[in-house]
Regions:
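Amphipathic, Lys/Arg-enriched alpha-helical "gate/interface" segment within cytosolic domains
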Residues: 1-155
Length: 155
């Protein structure tokens, strides 16, 4: 699977995107964002795109833009921050510069590792006095042992 998501660690909503993601896979991933939004509670998103090496075609890009706009319109007010793992230092730098020029509504950072992204997400939650579940802290410890670890279903 080249695109998927989980809210098993809510209020941390985790998304993974890889090269070759299909519209069907991306639709399922965006459904995870909708499900998180339907909870009606503040949350953060953590997206791992570290293995992406190529730009998707125009149809996929348009689909992602439309889905993102819809989710943001409906549930964006609940998102505290967004951390994105980006493999390329050049792309990471370019995205950071774009955010300096045109800041996003919510804080957004681009990191090199899942650990850095999760640490930032925890920090945002704590700053907003949103409870950080023990499963999120356990996942952080898991990442210390294995930087590529994926969360185990907590619920």
């Amino acid at each position: 699977m080249n695109a998927h998501g989980t809210d098993v660690l809510f209020p941390v909503v985790m998304l993974d995107v890889r090269d070759g993601a299909t519209i069907g896979e991306l639709r399922t991933m965006f459904d995870v964002l909708r499900t998180a939004g339907l909870r009606g509670k503040p949350h953060v998103t953590m997206t791992d795109s570290s293995t992406v090496r190529s730009m998707p075609d125009a149809t996929v890009r348009r689909f992602v833009a439309e889905q993102q706009a819809e989710v943001e319109t409906l549930y964006g007010h609940l998102v505290i921050g967004s951390a994105v793992v980006v493999g390329s230092s050049v792309v990471r730098g370019a995205l950071t510069a774009i955010n300096w020029i045109k800041p996003t509504r919510v804080p957004q950072v681009f990191t090199t590792t899942r650990m850095d992204a999760l640490v930032q997400c925890i920090s945002w939650l704590e700053q907003e006095a949103v409870a950080v579940p023990p499963e999120v802290r356990a996942y952080r410890m898991q990442l210390e042992r294995n930087p590529n670890a994926r969360p185990v279903a907590a619920r």
